[in-house]
Amino acid sequence: MTVADRAPLDVAIIGGGIIGIMTALGLLHRGFRVTVYERAASWPEIGAAFAFTGVARQCMERLDPRVLESLARVAQRSPHEKVRYWDGFHPRTKEAAQEESAVLFEILEKHMAYWACIRGHFLLDMAAQLPDGVVQFGKRLVDYNDDEANEKVVLCFADGSTAESDVVIACDGIHSATRKVLLGVDHPAANASYSRKSMYRAMVPMADAVSALGTEKAHVQIAHLGPDAHVVSFPVNNGQVYNVFLFLHDPNEWDHGHTMTVPSSRSEVMDAIQGWGPHIKEIVSCFPETVSKYAIFDQADNPLPYYASGRVCLAGDAAHASSPFHGAGACMGVEDALVLAELLGLVDAGPVAARQRNIKAALQTYSSVRIERSQWLVQSSRDMGDLYEWRYPPTGEDGAKCKAEFERRSKVIWDFDVDGMVAGAKKKYEHSMEA
């Protein structure tokens, strides 16, 4: 057999985000040829904040130690042993809102063991580990052809160019173009849908936060819960500024298409929290007059029936876009990346003549292994958003019930056997080869 006969698998990754670049590193680490096709013209400047659990970090190290090393360079470990969840609605004075009786429940941070980072910082650090030429910018996928008669999958881009690869991993996010091709544009799950939650963010001077909440609350991460809304807040910039995220339930449809950010106003936010305690109203009064309203989309209403078809698969948000209320959506994508890398490693080591069949078997195995856990996360995150806003009937406003439900669901995320997941996936793939 010639060297050419044993050429490594050629993998195309659609999307140069966190999961796409992480997957690329994991595959390169295993000797694959990898090309990442990113629709943007360059890397993003900053981006949102992400947090990764201990389970996700275990997956990163197994995927490629360089991934975890990148995270360690840019991440901040949670400095808080616990997060307190306060009543944002019933206290009628700022003083009452600071009393112990206003604490609904508190959660220890040791199990989730979050490391938080800015998306752009992590992405750029990982990207610096990639060889030159791996990433091609300005490549927006519009179609692909996975005809069995063709030796490779043909990718078609908006600029008129094409490319070929043995296997395609789509990490192109919540509005995945690949998902639309894989499922069909008319499939209910082809597009993510509005979760009926929106979010507003503001940076408040620390002095104003102390005035509204008190010194103790303003210097730690906390959450305030209440009817149809909740507020998550924490200090940043070495305690000089207070970062506030206010989430609202929205009974209406989102009438801005797939535009997820629209202009809004402080008065609109204030109208939504009428009846809340004076401490929350005071914090909102510190928002700038013009704010952005962020729509939260997910796949909870229309979960995908499968994540793979032929030699093409979806990973991360392209497969299971989640709301942020578990803080674990990106962690699911890390688990996806590890399973894919391990299964494709088996394909690459197998007979070249059977590669096309084996790629399909590996991707079907990946889909079957990952779909239950990742889709549980999507639905559970929806439920957690309702729990925080007293819209989840089993818990209502009861702090003890909220805590028990929070801990039960969180345990599914952090108490997870990564080695068992990988071993189970490999065993399932090997059984499919025997069929």
UniProtKB/Swiss-Prot annotation:
Membrane topology: Single-pass membrane protein
GO BP annotations listed: secondary metabolite biosynthetic process
Any one GO MF annotation of this record: monooxygenase activity
Keyword Oxidoreductase: yes
One of the record's GO cellular component terms: membrane
Highest taxon above the source species: Eukaryota
Uses, biotech or industry: Azasperpyranones display potential anti-cancer activities. Azasperpyranones A, C, D, and F exhibit potent growth-inhibitory activity against the A549, HepG2, HCT-116, and HL-60 cell lines, with IC(50) values of 2.39-14.42 mm, respectively. Moreover, azasperpyranone D significantly inhibits HCT-116 xenograft tumor growth in BALB/c-nu mice. In addition, azasperpyranones A and C can bind with four kinds of therapeutic targets for cancer, eEF2K, FGFR, survivin, and TNF-a.
Cofactor: FAD
Pathway(s) where this gene product acts: Secondary metabolite biosynthesis
Entry annotation: catalytic residues: R201
InterPro entries the record matches: FAD-bd, FAD/NAD-bd_sf, FAD_monoxygenase
Residues passing through the membrane, by range: 8-28
Induction: Expression is induced by the azasperpyranone cluster A-specific transcription factor ATEG_07666 which is itself regulated by the azasperpyranone transcriptional regulator ATEG_07667.
Null mutant phenotype: Abolishes the production of azasperpyranone A.
Keywords of this entry: FAD, Flavoprotein, Glycoprotein, Membrane, Monooxygenase, Oxidoreductase, Transmembrane, Transmembrane helix
Location in or out of the cell: Membrane
Protein EC: 1.-.-.-
Residue positions the entry lists as glycosylated: N191
Keyword Glycoprotein found: yes
Enzyme class: oxidoreductase
Residues that, per the record, bind FAD: E38, A51, R119, D317, A330
Function: FAD-dependent monooxygenase; part of the cluster B that mediates the biosynthesis of azasperpyranones, members of the azaphilone family that exhibit anti-cancer activities. Azasperpyranones are synthesized by 2 clusters, A and B. Cluster A is responsible for the production of the polyhydric phenol moiety while the azaphilonoid scaffold is produced by the cluster B. The non-reducing polyketide synthase ATEG_03629 produces 5-methyl orsellinic acid, which is then reduced to 5-methyl orsellinic aldehyde by the NRPS-like protein ATEG_03630.
Family that this chain belongs to: Belongs to the paxM FAD-dependent monooxygenase family.
Protein name as catalogued: FAD-dependent monooxygenase ATEG_07662
